[in-house]
């Protein structure tokens, strides 16, 4: 019986040679490197984003997911890393991202029209390698479609990015990667700040409600964190299970709105209206 088991093991290892490293060998929890997400409060909460792992950011619309994405892209491109964004519903605004500090010449933007295209593009980018961050934006995709993505797909992504310097960042409305994600954060909006327009603006725009969005405060809750970190961005004693961060709107001359990268709410409170 033992000889048959040894023979079977040898056959399986031979068949998987070059595709899976030592499938029957025990692997201890690996120590991963973490990098800043560009938001001090998030770094304090998580210790940073783990490389070679899948990180999932979920939350309802207007909860700060896109702002989190822009902040992370700005942080990674500022560190001279090449990043990739897989945009499942072609919702990315490069002008807003550039205003917030993202270096577009270091960003590969893959514009998709459905979830299946986005998943295939993400798979190709991971296999190609060379990216410091690959972001899969499923925020605007119907939740029922994202929910129907088979769990083996997320497992494949996790295994493909493992032992690489790439951060795989998935953004959606619900947590779908389950145990395949090393870090899961749930975002929600807590407060918003508004300011009244000037008399000149009110005269120019008679049908305007007279209020402009100044910014908002989002809360991030840590749902899952399984990565063992080698050099966390923030010390463990300073971390809790949730944190808040603010996003501030920038209004330019053409009255287009953008958002700045997130900042910790401890930097100063804003007036709530």
Task: Give residue spans per PLM region.
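Hydrophobic/aromatic ligand-binding patch that stacks against planar heteroaromatic rings
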Residues: 75, 96, 160
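C-terminal regions of RecA-like/P-loop NTPase motor modules
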Residues: 1-29, 191-273
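Charged, alpha-helix-enriched surfaces in structured cytosolic catalytic cores
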Residues: 34-37, 52, 64-71, 91-92, ...
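P-loop NTPase motor core
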Residues: 110-193
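Detector for small/aliphatic-rich hydrophobic stretches
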Residues: 1-85, 266-273
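Conserved inter-motif catalytic segment of the P-loop NTP-binding fold
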Residues: 60, 71, 79-145
């Amino acid at each position: 019986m033992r000889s048959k088991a040894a023979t079977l093991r040898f056959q399986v290892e031979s068949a998987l040679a070059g595709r899976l490293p030592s499938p029957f060998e025990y692997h201890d929890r690996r120590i991963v490197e973490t990098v800043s997400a560009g938001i001090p409060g998030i770094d304090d909460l998580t210790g940073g984003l783990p490389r070679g792992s899948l990180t999932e950011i979920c939350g309802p619309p207007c909860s700060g997911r896109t702002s989190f994405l822009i902040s992370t892209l700005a942080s990674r491109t500022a560190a001279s890393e090449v990043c990739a964004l897989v945009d499942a519903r072609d919702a990315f605004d490069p002008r807003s991202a550039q205003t917030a500090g993202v270096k577009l010449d270091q960003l590969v933007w893959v514009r998709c029209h459905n979830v299946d295209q986005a998943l295939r593009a993400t798979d190709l980018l991971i296999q190609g390698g060379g990216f410091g961050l690959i972001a899969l934006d499923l925020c605007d995709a119907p939740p029922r479609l994202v929910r129907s993505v088979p769990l083996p797909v997320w497992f494949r992504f996790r295994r493909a990015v493992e032992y690489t310097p790439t951060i795989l960042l998935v953004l959606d409305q619900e947590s779908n990667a389950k145990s395949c994600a090393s870090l899961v954060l749930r975002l929600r909006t807590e407060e918003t700040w508004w300011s009244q327009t000037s008399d000149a603006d009110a005269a120019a725009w008679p049908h305007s409600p007279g209020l402009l969005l100044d910014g908002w405060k989002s809360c991030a809750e840590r749902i899952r964190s399984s990565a063992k970190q080698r050099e966390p961005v923030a010390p463990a004693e300073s971390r809790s299970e949730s944190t808040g961060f603010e996003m501030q709107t920038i209004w330019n001359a053409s009255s287009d709105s953008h958002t700045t990268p997130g900042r910790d709410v401890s930097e100063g409170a804003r007036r709530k209206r």
